């Protein structure tokens, strides 16, 4: 049970498993920090059971060697259903944080830290249910990230002039079932599948041009920007 802000430091390779991550503490931050340098060894925190924690799970890979070496594996449909997940890392080539949907699962909110982040899974869906979310990282594998919150999902870097090029598999999908997809950083090169639900909105903010392609399965998609 997490009732106050706590830090879990990984100094080397290995896996830590929490069966039920519980705690009613929306201001609490569980920081999972990769602090080792060098190598491509992986540090993994696996959540194996249903949890009630409604604070922030913050992953940051503060390493100067290796890659994708700080992993949060959600291995239950309700492992982090009420939590906010914040992802970031030193850099894609030197250390990134990874959110893995080991099964179909849900979280409340996704929070932008920086671009060195990856959401991945194989044939699984990560559903985001909260009012708003933001993300500046990549999508990998065959994961589907489905935003159902009805508010705004912001995709892009905090600096509109900084390019966002998701280093991801073309088989990954970002789906907006309800609400608005806002491309905050206009400089986006898109290679994933983008699915917009009926009555959703695609908003392109001021910034450089957007390139790539999108395939809509909706009968009605609004646009603005």
Positions of the model-derived regions?
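Surface-exposed loop/turn positions within long extracellular repeat scaffolds
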Residues: 1-2, 12-28, 42-118, 132-142, ...
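Parallel beta-helix/beta-solenoid
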Residues: 10-11, 31-36, 145-151
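Short, charged low-complexity linear motifs
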Residues: 34, 39-40, 122-123
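Polar, glycosylation-prone regions of secreted, cell-surface, and some intracellular proteins
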Residues: 105, 124-125, 147
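Short, surface-exposed polybasic-and-hydrophobic patches located at secondary-structure transitions
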Residues: 121-130
């Amino acid at each position: 049970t997490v009732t106050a802000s706590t830090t879990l430091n990984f100094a080397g390779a290995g896996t830590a498993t929490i069966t039920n991550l519980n705690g009613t503490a929306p201001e609490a931050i569980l920081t999972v920090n990769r602090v080792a340098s060098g190598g491509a060894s992986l540090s993994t925190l696996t959540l194996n059971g249903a949890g009630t924690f409604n604070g922030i799970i913050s992953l940051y890979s503060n390493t100067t060697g290796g890659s994708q070496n700080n992993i949060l594996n959600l291995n239950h449909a309700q492992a982090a259903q009420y939590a906010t997940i914040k992802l970031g890392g030193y850099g894609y080539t030197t250390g990134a944080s990874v959110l893995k949907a080991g099964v179909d699962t849900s979280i409340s909110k996704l929070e932008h830290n920086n671009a060195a982040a990856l959401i991945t899974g194989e044939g699984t869906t990560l559903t985001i249910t909260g009012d708003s979310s933001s993300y500046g990282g990549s999508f990998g594998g065959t994961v589907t990230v489905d935003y159902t919150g009805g508010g705004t999902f912001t995709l892009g870097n905090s600096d509109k002039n900084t390019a966002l090029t998701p280093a991801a598999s073309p088989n990954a999908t970002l789906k907006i079932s309800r609400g608005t997809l806002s491309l905050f950083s206009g400089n986006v090169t898109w290679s994933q599948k983008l699915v917009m639900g009926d009555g959703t909105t695609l908003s392109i903010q001021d910034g450089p041009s957007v390139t790539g392609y999108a395939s809509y399965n909706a009968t009605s998609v609004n646009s603005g920007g």
